[in-house]
């Protein structure tokens, strides 16, 4: 499992290609998260919700994500129709799907449906908002491979302030379920990364701290020097 996972929030197809090119050229990167925001469950809408016809055209054309031979793509589905949208990203070569429990009416049914259609080659994870009760994910732990705690109160956009409530959420969850990999997404920086790792986080999902750095590659290298005792 990757300790540092760059996250990209695309505003357009062109923006997605440019942001992926920035990270996929780095030898140390073997996993990238793509944020997908529908403008309803979270806002503002990102690509492809900002241009739905483009997504359909890419699926029909058989487009694939770059460097699938060495990079695993994880799709963070901040949308109410995650089941439908997931199929398009899987056709592009994504192998990890993160569903937000608050966006799904019937989580067990969704997970079972996705698993029955796509098998075990994909990794399914559940994300939970900072204000939500972890019981929402705990009843589904047998069907997923990882949990994502949101480190910000307002999801769907990068650059939001880190919410320290996530420290206690992670601590308690990891103590109760040490076998489940935990990742934190939102507000991750060098100021809080070491503490998150010490509490049991396996992967740091990092967006704005890399995107807004003058040198993203150098910023990534600093994060990669961190050490985690939990499965990395």
Regions found by a protein language model. Give the residues of each.
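Hydrophobic faces of well-ordered beta-strands that scaffold small-molecule active sites
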Residues: 2-8, 30-34, 71-77, 97-99, ...
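Catalytic cores of alpha/beta
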Residues: 16-23, 83-91, 131-144, 187-204
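Conserved, mostly hydrophobic/aromatic
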Residues: 23, 34-35, 89, 147, ...
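Surface-exposed amphipathic alpha-helices with a cationic face
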Residues: 24, 59-67, 108-119, 168-178, ...
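A structural motif
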Residues: 26-31, 94, 144, 179, ...
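Glycine/Thr-rich beta-alpha phosphate-binding loop at enzyme active sites
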Residues: 42-51, 130, 136-177, 215-225
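Glycine/small-residue-rich loop that forms an oxyanion/phosphate-binding "nest" at active or ligand-binding sites
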Residues: 45-107
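Glycine-rich phosphate-binding active-site loops on the catalytic face of alpha/beta enzymes
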Residues: 97-106, 148-159, 199-220
């Amino acid at each position: 499992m990757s300790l540092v996972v760059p996250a990209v929030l695309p505003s357009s197809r062109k923006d997605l290609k440019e942001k992926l090119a920035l990270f996929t050229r780095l030898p140390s990167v073997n996993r990238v998260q793509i944020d997908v925001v529908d403008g309803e469950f979270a806002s503002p809408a990102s690509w492809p919700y900002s241009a739905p016809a483009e997504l359909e055209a890419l699926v029909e054309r058989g487009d694939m994500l770059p460097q699938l031979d060495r990079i695993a793509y994880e799709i963070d589905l901040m949308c109410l129709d995650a089941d439908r949208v997931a199929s398009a990203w899987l056709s592009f070569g994504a192998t990890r799907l993160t569903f937000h429990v608050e966006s799904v009416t019937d989580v067990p049914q969704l997970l079972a449906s996705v698993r029955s259609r796509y098998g075990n080659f994909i990794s399914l994870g559940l994300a939970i908002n900072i204000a939500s009760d972890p019981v929402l994910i705990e009843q589904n732990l047998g069907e997923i491979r990882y949990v994502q705690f949101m480190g910000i109160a307002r999801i769907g956009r990068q650059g939001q302030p880190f919410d320290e409530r996530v420290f206690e959420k992670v601590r308690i969850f990891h103590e109760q379920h040490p076998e489940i990999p935990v990742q934190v997404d939102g507000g991750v920086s060098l100021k809080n990364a070491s503490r998150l790792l010490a509490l049991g986080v396996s992967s740091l999902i990092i967006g704005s701290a890399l995107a807004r750095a003058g040198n993203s590659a150098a910023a990534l290298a600093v994060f990669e020097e961190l050490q985690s005792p939990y499965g990395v």
